[in-house]
Curated annotation (Swiss-Prot):
Belongs to the peptidase M24A family. Methionine aminopeptidase eukaryotic type 2 subfamily. NCBIfam families: met_pdase_II. SUPFAM superfamilies: Creatinase/aminopeptidase, Winged helix' DNA-binding domain. The gene is MAP2. Its EC number is 3.4.11.18. It is an enzyme of class 3 (hydrolase). HAMAP family: MetAP_2_euk (MF_03175). This is Methionine aminopeptidase 2. It comes from Candida dubliniensis (strain CD36 / ATCC MYA-646 / CBS 7987 / NCPF 3949 / NRRL Y-17841). Residues 74-91 have a biased composition (Basic residues). One of its GO terms (molecular function) is initiator methionyl aminopeptidase activity. Pfam families: Peptidase_M24.
Length: 452
C-alpha cells in the first residue's frame, strides 16, 4: 500500500518563510499508519497538526520579520497564543485520499491447491470475469482502508480507565467521519462494535447508561464492521494492557490459528479441512497464570462465516475445529475467517443484557403485533435493513420508548436478538479475524494491515 502524507498546513508556513527569507529549521512531523494512511485522514487528536499551531507559527514569522516590534508586544502575543484553546482536527472522508475511487488492494495469497491455482491463472476468461466485478472489489477495498485507519486510531487511543461507551463512540464516530455519510444503508458501520472483555467472547457492545470501565488487566476483543454499499468488511483483534505479558500466548495462539485458516482457505477447499488445521495450531498452545497451566482451546461453537450484500452471516460456517462438514468454498465468495481461543471450557452460552439485534431475512409472512411495533419495524428497515444494529444506533435515529415494541418484534421472530456469549467466569478469551475475497486466480486478504 502507498503512503500519502498531508502537506497543506506546512505549505502555508513555507510560503511565508520564503517571502521573509527565513530558514526553516524544524522538520515537519508525519505519522505513519499502515503505509496507506495520511495525516489528514487519521490523527484527529494530533496537536502538532492543529490549526492553532499554524496560527502560532504565523505569529512567530510576523514577529521575526518586523524589526520594529517591541519585546513587550512579543510577550503579549505569546501569552495570547498560550491561552488559545486547542482545536481538534476533523477526520476527512477517505474519498479525499483516493479521488479516482481506486483503493489499496489487500494481501494477495496463492490458493493451496496447485492444480486449481494453475488453471485459474491461465484462464483469461476467468480473469476477465473477475475484472467485471471491479466495483464490488473496490467497495470492499474502500471499507478495508477505512477499517485500517479506524483501528489504528483505536489502538493508539484506547487506555484503561475509559468507559466502554467512550471506546465505542471513539470507534464509531471515526467510521462515520471516514465514510462521510450518515445514511447507514449507503456506507458506514456494518454491525455493532464488539468490545467483549475477558470470559465474554463476543456480541457485547454497551447500551446507553452502561458504566463498565476498561481495566488494566482486561483482555478485550475489538470486532469492527464497516460496509460500503452493503459490502461488509469484518475484522477483529485483541487488545491487552498488562505489562507482564500475561496474555501473550493466548493472543499468539489465536492469531496464528486465524492465519492458518486463511492459508488453508480457497476455492473447492472443504470447510472441515480448514477447521482441522485451525484446531491443530490453536490447541498446541497453553497459558500460565499464577503457576497454573491452562490449555488453550478452540471455542467449538463459534465459527467464521461467508458474507453476502447486507448480510453478515450468509449461510456457510467456517469451523475452528474438525467437524466433518464437507461443504466446499466456491469462487467469488466472501468469507470472514475468525478464530476464538479460550482458557475455559471452549464452549460459550448466552448471558447478560442484549445489545445486538438484526432483522430476520424471512419476514414476509410475519406481521408486527401492534401499531407501535409496526412503526418501529419500518424505522429499522429504513435505517438498517438486514444489517445488525444495537440500541444506541436505534436511539441515534430518534427512537424513544421503544423497548416494549422491540421485545414484541423479538417474540414474534421478526427481529432476532444476539446477547453476549460467554465462557466460564474467570477464563480468558481472544479473537482475531480477517475478511478474504476468493478471486478466480488468487485470494485477497482485503482487511490485512501492518498491525495484524
Amino acid at each position: 500500500m502507498t503512503g500519502v502524507t498531508g502537506t497543506e498546513d506546512t505549505k502555508v508556513i513555507e510560503s511565508k518563510i520564503n517571502e521573509l527569507n527565513i530558514d526553516k529549521s524544524k522538520p515537519e512531523k508525519t505519522n505513519k499508519v499502515n503505509k496507506s494512511d495520511d495525516v489528514d485522514n487519521d490523527d484527529v487528536d494530533n496537536d502538532d497538526n492543529d490549526d492553532e499551531d499554524n496560527d502560532d507559527d504565523d505569529d512567530e514569522i510576523t514577529e521575526s520579520g518586523n524589526s520594529a516590534s517591541s519585546s513587550g508586544d512579543k510577550k503579549k502575543k505569546k501569552n495570547k497564543n498560550k491561552n488559545k484553546k486547542k482545536k481538534k482536527k476533523k477526520i476527512i472522508s477517505i474519498d479525499s485520499s483516493y479521488p479516482e475511487g481506486i483503493f489499496p488492494e489487500g494481501q494477495w495469497m496463492e490458493y493451496p491447491l496447485e492444480d486449481i491455482n494453475s488453471y485459474r491463472i491461465t484462464s483469461e476468461e476467468k480473469r476477465y470475469l473477475d475484472r467485471q466485478q471491479n466495483n464490488k472489489w473496490q467497495d470492499f477495498r474502500k471499507g478495508a482502508e477505512i477499517h485500517r485507519r479506524v483501528r489504528h486510531k483505536a489502538q493508539s487511543s484506547i487506555k484503561p480507565g475509559m468507559t466502554m461507551i467512550e471506546i465505542a463512540n471513539l470507534i464509531e464516530d471515526s467510521i462515520r467521519n471516514y465514510s462521510n455519510n450518515d445514511h447507514t444503508l449507503k456506507s458506514g458501520i456494518g454491525f455493532p462494535t464488539g468490545l467483549s472483555l475477558n470470559h465474554v467472547a463476543a456480541h457485547y457492545t454497551p447500551n446507553t447508561g452502561d458504566k463498565l470501565i476498561l481495566k488494566k488487566d482486561d483482555i478485550m476483543k475489538v470486532d469492527i464492521g464497516i460496509h460500503v454499499n452493503g459490502r461488509i468488511c469484518d475484522s477483529a483483534f485483541t487488545m491487552t494492557f498488562n505489562d507482564e505479558g500475561k496474555y501473550d500466548n493466548i493472543m499468539k495462539a489465536v492469531k496464528e490459528a486465524t492465519y492458518t485458516g486463511i492459508k488453508e482457505s480457497g476455492i473447492d477447499v472443504r470447510l472441515n479441512d480448514i477447521g482441522a488445521a485451525i484446531q491443530e495450531v490453536m490447541e498446541s498452545y497453553e497459558m500460565e497464570e499464577n503457576g497454573k497451566i491452562y490449555p488453550i482451546k478452540c471455542i467449538k461453537n463459534l465459527n467464521g462465516h461467508n458474507i453476502d450484500d447486507f448480510i453478515i452471516h450468509s449461510g456457510k460456517s467456517v469451523p475452528i475445529i474438525a467437524n466433518g462438514d464437507m461443504t466446499k468454498m466456491e469462487e467469488g465468495e466472501i468469507f470472514a475467517i475468525e478464530t476464538f481461543g479460550s482458557t475455559g471450557n471452549g464452549y460459550v452460552l448466552p448471558e447478560g443484557e442484549c445489545s445486538h439485534y438484526a432483522m430476520n431475512k424471512n419476514i414476509q409472512h410475519l406481521k408486527p403485533p401492534s401499531e407501535r411495533s409496526k412503526q418501529l419495524l419500518e424505522s429499522i428497515k429504513q435505517n438498517f435493513g438486514t444489517l445488525p444494529w444495537c440500541r444506541r444506533y436505534l436511539e441515534r435515529t430518534g427512537e424513544e420508548k421503544y423497548l416494549f415494541a422491540l421485545n414484541q418484534l423479538v417474540r414474534h421472530g421478526i427481529i432476532e436478538e444476539y446477547p453476549p456469549i460467554v465462557d466460564k467466569r474467570g477464563s480468558y478469551t481472544a479473537q482475531y479475524e480477517h475478511t478474504i475475497l476468493l478471486h478466480p486466480h488468487k485470494k485477497e486478504v482485503v482487511t490485512k494491515g501492518d498491525d495484524y
